[in-house]
Design a protein with these regions (language model features):
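N-terminal active-site beta-alpha-beta segment that forms phosphate/nucleotide-binding
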Residues: 1-77
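Conserved phosphate- and dinucleotide-binding cores of soluble alpha/beta proteins
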Residues: 3-7, 58-218
Length: 218
């Protein structure tokens, strides 16, 4: 059975390491803030000018003045800081972000990503994604394995406008965890109840499969 959005976020949260500074992109990635392991300290950054994001607020306790880059209300942790976007992007471009988690429309087996524009649909711009893919030390994509029409998002070539090339290291989808290696996609884990055959069928590129593939632990 495929994961829902929260399941994807839970699995991404297992990639966080103590001391990391992490930027969470719009969409599924923002949910990761709810699942940061309690035994580590991670500082979450939002490019609109907030360092030290906490979980989403409980119902009825939201502060409308506290929002992330996706305009969602958030909470802050002790020691959090607010600043303008120029300083926020100085942090990003200066290489001070250890990990970025982004959503995507397409990802290739070489690590290319398209995440900001679908021709014919109105968009407000790419936000901070291009700066993030060019500067972050590690990039994970959190996404569904296929689009709403059932077509693979994991491909050999991006057909949509690119955000960055050869930058994505890992994909966590509703079906699988896949590393991007020098030889292409490599299957690491599968979602509970999902077969290797289903993953291969729904991936638009060859996938390396070595030995028994374990189920994800959430």
């Amino acid at each position: 059975m495929s994961l829902d959005k929260n399941g994807i976020a839970k699995r991404v949260a297992r990639e966080l390491k103590d001391g990391y500074y992490v930027n969470l992109g719009i969409g599924i990635p923002t949910l990761v803030a709810n699942y940061v392991p309690e035994n580590i300290e991670v500082i979450l950054q939002s490019e609109n000018g907030l360092l030290g994001i906490g979980p989403f607020p409980e119902k009825g306790k939201a502060d409308p003045d506290l929002i992330n880059a996706g305009k969602q209300t958030v909470t802050t942790i002790p020691g959090s800081a607010f600043f303008d976007s120029s300083l926020s992007f100085a942090m990003i471009r200066g290489g001070h972000v250890d990990l970025t988690v982004l959503g995507a429309f397409e990802v290739t087996d070489k690590g290319d990503i398209s995440s900001w524009k679908i021709p014919g649909k109105m968009v407000k711009g790419m936000g901070g994604a291009m700066d993030l893919v060019a500067s972050a030390k590690n990039i994970i994509v959190a996404t569904t394995h296929t689009d709403r029409h059932g077509k693979p998002k994991l491909k050999t070539r991006c057909d949509l406008p690119l955000t960055g090339i050869r930058c994505v290291k890992k994909i966590v989808s509703d079906l699988a965890v896949i590393d991007i290696t020098d030889k292409g996609f490599k299957l690491i884990e599968r979602a509970p109840g999902v077969s290797v055959e289903e993953i291969l069928e729904k991936t638009g590129a060859p996938v390396i499969v070595e030995g028994d593939i374990p189920e994800m632990k959430l």
